């Protein structure tokens, strides 16, 4: 499994790579996954729908990532949105 970060102008950057069947490598993947979420990134697992259409499923924890996933892609949350309520 590869953990990748999308970086504008650079494409995909490999953050971590390992085999989830090897406990030490799985721990490293989990730690890297958590660091990205803690940094405010979103995580998505690419999938392929029937008919060949490419999609992605957002995940919020490493436990939600399918064991056979080849990669998880991290990307920044969209900026903006509703203004903060004034107090």
Regions found by a protein language model. Give the residues of each.
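Alpha-mannosidase-like glycoside hydrolase catalytic domains involved in N-glycan trimming
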Residues: 20-21, 46, 64
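Ordered hydrophobic segments in well-structured contexts
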Residues: 5, 41-46, 71-75
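Extended boundary segments
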Residues: 1-40
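A short linear-motif detector with a strong N-terminal bias
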Residues: 21-24, 50-54
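Short, basic/aromatic beta-hairpin or loop at an interaction surface
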Residues: 36-53
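Short, compact, well-ordered microdomains
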Residues: 51-87
């Amino acid at each position: 499994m590869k953990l990748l970060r999308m970086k504008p102008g650079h494409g995909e950057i490999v953050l971590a790579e390992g085999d989830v069947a090897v406990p030490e490598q799985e721990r490293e993947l989990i730690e890297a996954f958590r660091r990205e979420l803690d940094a405010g990134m979103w995580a998505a697992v690419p999938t392929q729908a029937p008919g060949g259409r490419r999609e992605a499923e957002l995940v919020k924890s490493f436990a939600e990532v399918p064991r056979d996933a080849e990669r998880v892609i991290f990307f920044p949350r969209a900026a903006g949105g509703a203004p903060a309520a004034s107090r």
